[in-house]
From Swiss-Prot:
Name by which UniProt lists this protein: Protein transport protein SEC24
Biased amino acid composition, Low complexity: 11-39, 47-73, 97-114, 136-223, 231-269
Binding residue positions for Zn(2+): C334, C337, C356, C359
Compartments, record wording: Cytoplasmic vesicle, COPII-coated vesicle membrane; Endoplasmic reticulum membrane; Golgi apparatus membrane
Region annotation (Disordered) ranges: 1-273
Region named Zinc finger-like: 334-359
InterPro entries registered for this protein in UniProt: ADF-H/Gelsolin-like_dom_sf (IPR029006), Gelsolin-like_dom_sf (IPR036180), Sec23/24_helical_dom (IPR006900), Sec23/24_helical_dom_sf (IPR036175), Sec23/24_trunk_dom (IPR006896), Sec23_24_beta_S (IPR012990), SEC23_SEC24_subfamily (IPR050550), vWFA_dom_sf (IPR036465)
Principal place of residence: membrane
Topology versus the membrane: Peripheral membrane protein
Gene: sec24
Length: 1013
């Protein structure tokens, strides 16, 4: 029997300088218990999503029940919102800048780098007002700070040998600097200006008042000049403070210039002691974003504002500024909490010691890391050579202390269904062609280290020996006993892809051309997964499963649930949870996680597949699930091939674990994403790719006495090139004592994403109807809190109204589109009351758990474009000329009978053909003379034709598809199409639909609820 190895876990709380790692945490067993939305499999429970920790239960409010339309005769039979057009309210850049084109939802101290992403900017946004929490405001009467109770220091995990000194009180205001404009749309976060030092007094936080329109250039603080690097700083003992005295020097022929030693002034101490968040040292927003870019200093303030506090982490996001800098020097960490060195630590004793910004423990600086501090700048002399002290996003090259075994090469093992349905639908042929296309990229990305293996199955298992032989043809083994699967040694079925490329290509050709006369419909997926696990358990990697039937073998057999009577009832949520038969896949997923194996599922079926049960494999192992119902290669082959290629070639972290650390007072309540919770704060991620995010739901457990709060995430992983690295993100944000200020710093992108993930948990634990009510109630609670804040201090909380035709509903500037997203969310396929196949709804629920912010917002509020060029359109003169088509509001008011429109939600692209579209225009775009000759069942993309209409339509489609990681499936919707037209109409969420009221009616109900309360 093969012995199981213990695989690398995060050593972040176990390794200290000069010490060996502690023994590995034993594998957490999966207990028998009711389903929980997050795969914690322990005693951790998810709190009620619409309540924060230590929050008193609010009286149940009257739920918003959107009136159902009684008679729908088409798109035109709707209640409209007026003739005004709404600019498309989505943050297209996956980033909320201070001068946002969408809304002021990004008043953050954690700002990102200034370069925008052109492929994600399809629409400019409305004017907004910008605020900056780090710029000192006009003189106002400071608010009385409540007396804070002294906090007990956190108990260290390892007792230091010497007693640490107590932190001192410092003035936190840096020197006043000049502000100059910059020529970018990304703001700079300016530090507060220096104020007169007063003993035992600090300046309270002053919220900023709007001073300029949104399209004015943001101001940037001029950086102070840095001194030249000291050539001999490594020779000075770190216990000395050479900058506190001026040594005696006398030039020949001159009089003595000796001066008395000078003590550090309070201003010098402040410059050294208080690091200030700036644009350069904060983690860029594509990697890490908070729902509120300011932290309340007490739990009661968070409870009063009702905005959920959460953190969105995108570990492998694309950064327009370039790759993340890699640090090859030794890793410096806090002795107590194991925080990594970052730009927000405080340097003491001239650089000889440093205070942790998380736990405030004072640590000694290693001699090989010491550098003196220049008190004129408050920075180390070697700051330019230390990326970890300049940027909030760096990677450390991990030492041998972070290794339990040598880094394993990337391993790809394919499990392909070759049943009758896979052959006749064209899935097998499409998959083999796509795999052939990726072989060269897999070799290049792994520096020739990638391993490859493949097996096929129907009612038996087929293994292929890929070892090199004189004929370069594989040897095939067939196993028919599905109860006790015998697997030969794994070395025969996993080969180095570069060395065995010819054998691999021949194997794929043989599988593709193998004659299959019997129509086998049995699928032994469970046995195939067991065999693949036995082959790959020693090396880890990724299992890619292509499945056409619901599993019917002796292992992992899933029964077809009778779902029709449950649709539309409270018990519908049971169809979205794993069945009792799915326990096999949960246990298998836990075994895969312990051996660093992830599972990617590609599901093709004409009937019920039970994606809720099979999706557990992806959810626990950090994999992905793709769902193609009623797959036909002539219609869906292009989408499937593109997504398979993307899933294999995207950036991937292997053998990963992640931990998030917070400063005192902040707590992490739950996680959302595909992961396995090894301990209370350690996430196991066999793989995590560039498309996935992890969302944290947070709370405040105690008063926060510091001026800034810090958060740091650390991802320990194996790079595809073979290096073991630690990717560290760090942010520091201001702490406020007035809940009215929090509305200024809300980020609607993170707030919307967090509400949707919490609502999914609510739907799984209760019902879809309760989830819809909870979404609407959360919106009411936030707007009620804002109304109370505006009533008490109107000047500090500027409000906006939607339009002149809409009801006078006051909304915070940063959350002015929250009601629109709430309506979109309730009408989406995830929460809609419309009859929906449970496989499709469960698939989208799991997909939403890992979506990035841009894809999440656009899924709820899609893009709406016209594919006909406007009259004043001028073609771009150069290929690099920006192209931004106009997006309409999602209402039937924008539809025209002689038009051609596209609606895209990041997953599907709908083309709506008006019934009076001119015949010459139709021919120029589709290449056929009449709409009746267009086969919508096999249509995949627009043909490439040499005319202006075709070029413009294809340019819009290309722009939209490049904005998403997945390839979009395209559907053609004719005006007479009874199947696709209801799907298209359901995306016009601002109109009244069978799923609920119009946006205008929802605003009226919101105003009524807020006024009554």
């Amino acid at each position: 029997m093969t012995s199981k190895r213990q695989y690398p876990i995060d050593q972040s709380n176990q390794l200290s300088q000069g010490q060996n790692p502690s023994p590995q945490q034993p594998l957490q067993q999966y207990p028998q218990q009711p389903y929980q939305p997050n795969p914690t499999y322990g005693n951790d429970t998810t709190q009620q999503w619409n309540q924060t920790p230590q929050q008193q239960q609010q009286p149940q409010q009257q739920n918003i029940s959107p009136p159902q339309s009684q008679n729908q005769n088409g798109v035109q039979n709707t209640i409209h919102t007026g003739g005004s057009k709404r600019v498309y309210p989505v943050d297209p850049q996956n980033e909320t800048l201070l001068s946002s084109n969408f809304s002021n939802m990004n008043l953050s101290s954690q700002q990102q780098q200034p370069l925008p992403q052109p492929t994600h900017i399809p629409v400019p946004g409305p004017n907004t007002t910008t605020y900056n929490p780090y710029i000192q405001q006009p003189q106002q009467q400071p608010q009385q700070q409540p007396q804070q109770q002294p906090q007990q220091p956190q108990q260290p995990q390892q007792q230091p040998q010497q007693q640490t000194q107590q932190p001192q009180t410092w003035n936190t205001s840096p020197p006043q600097t000049q502000q100059q404009p910059i020529q970018t749309f990304t703001p700079h976060i300016s530090p507060p200006q220096t104020q007169q030092q007063q003993p035992q007094q600090t300046t309270p936080f002053q919220p900023m008042q709007p001073t300029q329109p949104s399209y004015s250039q943001p101001q940037q603080t001029q950086p102070l000049p840095l001194p030249p690097m000291q050539p001999s700083y490594n020779q000075q003992p770190y216990t000395q403070q050479p900058y506190t005295q001026q040594p005696y020097t006398q030039q020949p022929g001159q009089q003595s210039q000796y001066q008395q030693p000078q003590q550090q002034t309070p201003q010098q101490q402040a410059a050294v002691e208080q690091p200030v968040p700036t644009l350069e040292n904060l983690c860029p927003k594509p990697f890490m974003r908070l729902s509120m870019n300011a932290i309340p200093n007490h739990p009661s303030i968070l409870n009063k504002v009702h905005i959920p506090l959460g953190l969105n982490i995108h570990p492998l996001a694309h950064d327009p500024q370039g790759p993340v800098p890699v640090v090859y020097s030794s890793i410096i960490r806090c002795r107590r909490c194991r925080t990594y060195i970052n730009p927000f630590v405080t340097w003491l004793n001239g650089g000889g010691r440093w205070r942790c910004n998380m736990c405030e423990n004072i640590n000694d600086t290693p001699q090989d890391y010491f550098s003196p501090i220049d008190f004129t700048t408050g920075k180390r002399s070697d700051i330019l050579n230390r990326p970890e002290l300049q940027k909030g996003c760096v990677e450390f090259l991990a030492s041998s202390d972070y290794l339990v075994r040598p880094p394993q090469p990337p391993t790809y093992f394919f499990i392909v269904d070759v049943c009758y349905e896979s052959i006749v639908s064209g899935m097998l042929n499409t998959a083999i062609n796509a795999i052939k296309t990726t072989l060269g990229d897999l070799i290049e990305k792994s520096n020739g280290r990638a391993r490859f293996g493949i097996m096929t199955f129907d009612d038996s298992l087929h293994f292929y020996n890929l070892k090199s032989n004189p004929s370069n043809r594989p040897q095939m083994f067939v196993v028919t006993d599905m109860d006790q699967v015998y697997v030969p040694p794994f070395e025969d079925f996993l080969v180095n892809l570069k060395d065995g490329l010819e054998v691999v290509e021949n194997t794929l050709n043989i599988i593709q051309s193998m004659p299959r006369t019997q129509q086998k419909v049995e699928s032994c997926l469970g046995s195939a997964l067991k065999a693949a696990f036995s082959i790959c358990e020693r090396v880890g990697g990724k299992l890619i499963v292509l499945q056409s039937y619901i599993p019917r073998g002796p292992l992992g057999k899933l029964s077809i649930r009778d779902y029709q009577p449950l649709l539309g009832t409270k018990k519908e949520s049971t169809l979205l949870q794993p069945s009792n038969d799915g326990e096999f896949y949960k246990e298998l997923a836990l075994s895969c996680t312990s051996q660093q194996l992830s599972v990617d599922l590609f599901l093709f079926s004409n009937d019920y597949t039970d994606t809720a049960s099979l999706g557990t494999l992806c959810q626990i192992t950090g994999g992905s699930m793709y769902y193609y119902p009623s797959f036909v290669a002539s219609r869906d082959g292009q989408v499937f091939a593109a997504n398979l290629i993307h899933s294999l070639t995207r950036d991937t972290a292997w053998e990963a674990v992640m931990r998030v650390r917070t400063s005192r007072g902040l707590t992490i309540n739950s996680y959302h994403g595909n992961y396995f919770l090894k301990t209370s704060d350690l996430l196991g991620l066999p793989t995590i790719d560039s498309d996935k995010t992890i969302t944290l739901q947070m709370g405040i457990s105690d008063s926060i006495g510091q001026k800034y709060a810090s958060l740091q995430s650390a991802l320990l992983y194996t790079h595809s090139c073979g290096e073991r690295r630690v990717r560290v993100f760090t942010i520091s944000i201001p702490v406020v004592s007035n809940y009215q200020d929090l509305f200024r710093y809300a980020d609607i992108s993170v707030v919307t994403s967090l509400i949707s993930k919490m609502a999914i948990d609510k739907a799984l634990s209760s019902s879809l109807n309760d989830a819809r009510d909870a979404i609407a109630n959360k919106c009411v609670e936030i707007l009620q809190a804002f109304k109370a804040a505006s009533t008490s201090n109107p000047q500090a909380n500027p409000a906006v109204t939607l339009s002149q035709n809409a009801p006078k509903l006051l909304l915070p500037e940063t959350l002015k589109h929250l009601p629109l997203y709430v309506v979109s969310m309730v009408k989406s396929i995830i929460f809609s009351s419309r009859t929906t196949h449970p496989d499709l709804r469960a698939f989208h629920m799991q997909r939403m758990k890992t979506l990035d912010l841009n894809s999440c917002l656009n899924f709820f509020y899609p893009y709406f474009y016209s594919l006909l060029a406007p009259p004043n359109y001028q073609p771009p003169t150069t290929p690099n000329t920006p192209f931004v088509p106009h997006s309409f509001k999602l209402s039937s008011d924008e539809l025209q009978r002689n038009g051609l429109f596209a609606i895209v939600n990041g997953y599907t692209l709908y083309l709506f053909i008006g019934e009076q579209l001119p015949q010459p225009v139709f021919t120029d775009i589709f290449g056929v003379p009449d709409v009746s000759q267009l086969d919508i069942n096999t249509f995949q993309d627009l043909p490439i034709l040499d005319n202006d209409h075709s070029r413009y339509a294809r340019k819009v489609i290309e722009l939209v598809r490049n904005s998403y990681p997945e390839y979009l499936k395209m559907f053609v919707v004719k005006s007479t199409d009874r199947q696709r037209r209801p799907e298209f109409q359901s995306l016009l969420i601002e109109d009244r639909t069978p799923e609920g009221c119009s946006y205008y009616e929802f605003i009226i109900q919101l105003q009524s609820r807020i006024t009554q309360n």
